């Protein structure tokens, strides 16, 4: 029976950001302001469209977030690359949560589509990562599709998100 934790609070994901969750030299999340979600609401190594696992997370949007004043002055919009980065962050977190070793690095994505935007009027962003494959060899590689919703409407989709875990070579 799986006894892994299936959700994480903001305080718990900050522990991961400090490198204290999965052990030294292993996957960690960025710290604020680059951390792009406030909580992981559900994570499982089974289920999802491919029955290979999934992650669900949320980000509370407030008008005072750091990116709104500079992107763009007079026309504030969350940069699309931050939503994409959140998907990579969650993909890497999943690999560490599985117990895999190494530092997480985004490798690539297939196709990305933006069909809406996050503005200061948005209240909640939701993320979904649906795994297609986890490869465990010299390199641990997670491959997943992702989506992002703003107030319930899907506005970003990404296919074939790839994150690898890399172990440092001994000198």
UniProtKB/Swiss-Prot annotation:
PANTHER family attached to this UniProt entry: 3-HYDROXYACYL-[ACYL-CARRIER-PROTEIN] DEHYDRATASE, 3-HYDROXYDECANOYL-[ACYL-CARRIER-PROTEIN] DEHYDRATASE
A GO molecular function held by the record? trans-2-decenoyl-acyl-carrier-protein isomerase activity
One Gene Ontology biological process: unsaturated fatty acid biosynthetic process
- Provide GO CC annotations from the record: cytoplasm
Q: What is this protein called?
A: 3-hydroxydecanoyl-[acyl-carrier-protein] dehydratase
Name the residues annotated as catalytic in the UniProt entry. 71
**Where is the protein localized?**
Cytoplasm
Question: Where along the sequence do coiled-coil regions lie?
Answer: none
Q: What does this protein do?
A: Necessary for the introduction of cis unsaturation into fatty acids. Catalyzes the dehydration of (3R)-3-hydroxydecanoyl-ACP to E-(2)-decenoyl-ACP and then its isomerization to Z-(3)-decenoyl-ACP. Can catalyze the dehydratase reaction for beta-hydroxyacyl-ACPs with saturated chain lengths up to 16:0, being most active on intermediate chain length.
Describe, as the record does, how this protein assembles with itself and its partners: Homodimer.
Q: InterPro entries given for it?
A: FabA, FabA_FabZ, HotDog_dom_sf
Gene name for this UniProt entry: fabA
Q: EC number(s) for this protein?
A: 4.2.1.59, 5.3.3.14
HAMAP family for this protein: FabA (MF_00405)
| Family to which the UniProt record says this protein belongs | Belongs to the thioester dehydratase family. FabA subfamily.
Catalytic reaction annotation: a (3R)-hydroxyacyl-[ACP] = a (2E)-enoyl-[ACP] + H2O; (3R)-hydroxydecanoyl-[ACP] = (2E)-decenoyl-[ACP] + H2O; (2E)-decenoyl-[ACP] = (3Z)-decenoyl-[ACP]
Top-rank lineage group of the source organism: Bacteria
Q: Which NCBIfam families match?
A: fabA, PRK05174.1
> Would the keyword Ion transport turn up in this protein's UniProt record?
no
Alphabetically list the UniProt keywords. Answer: Cytoplasm, Fatty acid biosynthesis, Fatty acid metabolism, Isomerase, Lipid biosynthesis, Lipid metabolism, Lyase
Q: In which pathway does it act?
A: Lipid metabolism; fatty acid biosynthesis
Q: Does the keyword Lyase apply?
A: yes
